[in-house]
């Protein structure tokens, strides 16, 4: 029974990832005044399936001087972690109801660094290694701001459990009182998932393709799927934390539709950002976090702690 539950969570993610690639290409096409994919199938709808067949039927090529074991394990680890993170997300009910589900998600997303680092090191290519080192520094840096923002959210929520956020936001979404944190969180999720304008790990003009430059066929597709699964997961988490997914036990379907629609809107915002902004310089990327986001998030965290303490000091009004 547990296996069926696992499959019902993980299997819908794969077609969602496939069609997100199509939506991205279509959206970027229309934003750049062109059509995008429109040949394979009606309106280009079968393009992701054609891409998947092409990639998984090709033979993977291993560089002669690469570390074959790590080279193969890295993309498998990336996709496994990307799918595992979905387990505690309430949609409206989680696969595994953990007490520390928020901490679990942060820990799992931190482990993604290893797959990128291994792929860059195992490729034995200077471009791949440079991209991997950039990715590691970037991901670790923005994890700091995300963890501090999460701490503020937990103070408002009173629990690390994601299901409790639905109860907290029954009357007011946390995006309204905590909009500065929401803005910093959204920017941090862009950096965490290595998306434009923070896509320095795969800077085509400098590093050819970044950490996955030596990958082809199936392993490359696994990295691609992991990246897009992480994008959808981060947006789903943003919806749970800031935009309230009220769960009605009588009609859980309404809650699921509500949750999915909000996640789709945020995901389209991710694509919109890619179409609108140029890539950051690497020093600007680090400056933004360590000199701007970190002091602000720490100050807001202290502010939220002081609010709770000051409210607790007020005597009850008759």
Curated annotation (Swiss-Prot):
Its main location: mitochondrion. GO terms for biological process: mitochondrial electron transport, NADH to ubiquinone; mitochondrial respiratory chain complex I assembly. The chain crosses the membrane at residues 2-22, 69-89, 102-122, 146-166, 171-191, 222-242, 253-273, 294-314. Signal peptide: none annotated. Its EC number is 7.1.1.2. One of its GO terms (cellular component) is mitochondrial inner membrane. It is found in: Mitochondrion inner membrane. Pfam families: NADHdh. It catalyses: a ubiquinone + NADH + 5 H(+)(in) = a ubiquinol + NAD(+) + 4 H(+)(out). GO terms for molecular function: NADH dehydrogenase (ubiquinone) activity. Keywords: Electron transport, Membrane, Mitochondrion, Mitochondrion inner membrane, NAD, Respiratory chain, Translocase, Transmembrane, Transmembrane helix, Transport, Ubiquinone. Belongs to the complex I subunit 1 family. Core subunit of the mitochondrial membrane respiratory chain NADH dehydrogenase (Complex I) which catalyzes electron transfer from NADH through the respiratory chain, using ubiquinone as an electron acceptor. Essential for the catalytic activity and assembly of complex I. Core subunit of respiratory chain NADH dehydrogenase (Complex I) which is composed of 45 different subunits. This is NADH-ubiquinone oxidoreductase chain 1. It comes from Elephas maximus (Indian elephant). The lineage of its organism: Eukaryota, Metazoa, Chordata, Craniata, Vertebrata.
């Amino acid at each position: 029974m547990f296996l069926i539950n696992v499959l019902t969570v993980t299997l819908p993610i794969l077609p969602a990832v496939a069609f997100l690639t199509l939506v991205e290409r279509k959206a970027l096409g229309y934003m750049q005044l062109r059509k995008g994919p429109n040949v394979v199938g009606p309106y280009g709808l079968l393009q992701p399936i054609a891409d998947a067949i092409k990639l998984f039927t090709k033979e993977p090529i291993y560089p002669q001087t690469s570390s074959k074991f790590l080279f193969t394990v890295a993309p498998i680890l990336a996709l496994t972690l990307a799918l595992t993170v979905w387990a505690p997300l309430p949609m409206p009910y989680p696969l595994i109801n953990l007490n520390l589900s928020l901490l679990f998600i942060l820990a799992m997303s931190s482990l993604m660094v290893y797959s990128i680092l291994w792929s860059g090191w195992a490729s034995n290519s200077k471009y791949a290694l440079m991209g991997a080192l950039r990715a590691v520094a970037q991901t670790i840096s923005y994890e700091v701001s995300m963890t501090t923002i999460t701490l503020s959210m937990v103070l408002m929520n009173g629990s690390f459990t994601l299901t409790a956020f639905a109860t907290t936001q029954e009357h007011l979404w946390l995006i309204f009182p905590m909009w500065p944190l929401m803005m910093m969180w959204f920017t941090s999720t862009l950096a965490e998932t290595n998306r434009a304008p923070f896509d320095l790990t795969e800077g085509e003009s400098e590093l050819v393709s970044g950490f996955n430059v030596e990958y082809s066929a199936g392993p490359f597709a696994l990295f691609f799927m992991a990246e897009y699964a992480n994008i959808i997961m981060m947006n789903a988490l943003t919806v749970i934390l800031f935009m309230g997914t009220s769960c009605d036990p009588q009609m859980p379907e309404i809650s699921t539709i509500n949750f999915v629609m909000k996640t789709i809107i945020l995901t389209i915002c991710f694509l919109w950002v890619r179409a609108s902004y140029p890539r950051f310089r690497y020093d600007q990327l680090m400056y933004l976090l360590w000199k701007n986001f970190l002091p602000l998030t720490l100050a807001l965290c202290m502010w939220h702690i002081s609010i709770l303490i000051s409210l607790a000091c007020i005597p009850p009004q008759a």
